[in-house]
Amino acid sequence: MSSFRSHTSGELRKSHVGETVRLAGWVHRKRDHGGLLFIDLRDNYGLTQLVFDPDRAEAFALAEKLRAEYVVAIEGKVVARSAETINANLPTGDIEIAVSSMEVLSEAQDLPLPVFGEPDYPEDIRLTYRFLDLRRETLHRNILLRSKIIADIRRRMTEVGFNEFQTPILTASSPEGARDFLVPSRMHPGKFYALPQAPQQFKQLIMVAGFDRYFQIAPCFRDEDARADRSPGEFYQLDVEMSFVTQDDVFAAIEPVLHGLFEKFAEGKKVSSYPFTRIPYAEAIRKYGSDKPDLRNPIVMESVTDHFRGSGFKVFAGLIEKDSKVEVWAIPAPGGGNRAFCDRMNSWAQGEGQPGLGYIFFREEGGALEGAGPVAKNIGPERTEAIRTQLGLKAGDAVFFVAGVPAKTASFAGLARTRVGTELGLIEEDIFKFCWIVDFPMFEWNEDEKKIDFSHNPFSMPNYPLDKFLKLDKDNADEILGMTAFQYDIVCNGVELSSGAIRNHKPDVMYKAFEIAGYDKSVVETKFGGMLNAFKYGAPPHGGLAPGIDRMVMLLAGVENLREVTMFPMNQQAQDLLMQAPSEVEPKQLKELHIRVVPPLEKKKEG
């Protein structure tokens, strides 16, 4: 294998007994057992137990001086462990190495965090000493898993006819989305490049250039605040674009890739079969309170507005009477039919800034089924029974209610649905459930600016007859706000993996879409001139999507923070503690770039 080793620390088995081998790696753990020294040697591939006998005086003396994380190379004979010392939890647990010679390749200082074991350590220490953190078993395994997933994606995409192309890292600033990371130009004073938020325009230009099927494991850069599932700096996505396709064609191409990928790395979990479930956006909001529903949770919300209209529960009845847009949504809670659970959910809702969470729980009383709680008392037995019948509830079940204008209350209702499902143990644990969210609204009403605006992606093709679309004006507001687009998200277990769309490749339709949203033609030409100009020279119908690599790896690794699947992440303040970035630069460098740093103004103290 090399002059340092004949085998790795993860490959030796009983079949190697009697062989003389060379290994190299890190001292993982050291133990003294009555004269013999035992050392677990670790490398990228696993652990092997080394045995040092005092009869081998030179090697033994050297072993006595070893400390954790020293790097050593050894030579010795593979011997079988005795029956009582076999370690069934270790792939190499049937053997050990009787060391005859050893060389210390590198020493290690006292460790700021342990590599052995998985203790919780402060994030700042873990990121400052990331090279040590990466030696820890779980994180090391996650990073290797990421590599395998990316390699498998590349193989699958190539096998179904996609070509991998690289797009520029230095590009123009984008007027849409998050803040750009700007790069000053030395050759063009006062002008800036931007790191790409996504290769969106480039991948569409690749379609215009006639390459038909493109993919890339694309780095994307956005100057935005961190979240558990979002880096403050860069992230990677499986960027995909296809020519001469409909929405159905895109789904048919990507579903086998994602299904096969997840099935391969699911570690025994099931993966929902394809074609994946398709849920219109409006239905997702109504049933699940979210456009990224977790379908492992069986709870489906229903409207029970009519059961409260004119009822004795004045809080809801009053809201319904005042505003025709108000709805009351019911969140069934199978098995949650006791006052303690209902009160706990009510307290949770108050902690979320809500006045509370109305509920009814059902119980058998004297052989009869009855609803209990303040809501049931106020609306009476007839309405209570109608709600129970509609939702199919039985004794021992409960139902919670959220009332208001859906646009304002849907998000909280979705949180309550998730909370109920989690608290009652209703969520399936051993499955990856995919779905598509389709039929997103093309436009929405911007209440702050009192105007029609784009709802999501301004470059999507409207799901509307194009000849009629070109004739629309602001007098057709209801028609415009009811229009959907060929936009879609793919969701797995409540995690949005990707947005995508069939693109608007027709300049006249694009001009019209921006006009409806209040943008002048000149603005479109200034901001998107490169792509728009290309569309004037024969553009095929095209569409695509871009599932996030980080989020897919997080799901498959079973972790909730992307720092557990990213090799060198930034912290929450967008700092790289290991490399000490961002940092100040030399005045000479700023001068070459024609830049002067102006310190931020200090805020005036009040009073």
UniProtKB/Swiss-Prot annotation:
Transmembrane segments: none annotated. InterPro entries: Aa-tRNA-synt_II, aa-tRNA-synth_II, aa-tRNA-synth_II/BPL/LPL, Asp-tRNA-ligase_1, Asp-tRNA-ligase_1_N, Asp/Asn-tRNA-synth_IIb, AspRS_core, GAD-like_sf. It is found in: Cytoplasm. Keywords: Aminoacyl-tRNA synthetase, ATP-binding, Cytoplasm, Ligase, Nucleotide-binding, Protein biosynthesis. L-aspartate binds at residues 176, 222, 456, 503. Residues 200-203 are annotated as: Aspartate. The keyword Methyltransferase does not apply. It is an enzyme of class 6 (ligase). It catalyses: tRNA(Asx) + L-aspartate + ATP = L-aspartyl-tRNA(Asx) + AMP + diphosphate. The record marks 33 as: Important for tRNA non-discrimination. CDD domains: AspRS_core, EcAspRS_like_N. Aspartyl-tRNA synthetase with relaxed tRNA specificity since it is able to aspartylate not only its cognate tRNA(Asp) but also tRNA(Asn). Reaction proceeds in two steps: L-aspartate is first activated by ATP to form Asp-AMP and then transferred to the acceptor end of tRNA(Asp/Asn). This is Aspartate--tRNA(Asp/Asn) ligase. The gene is aspS.
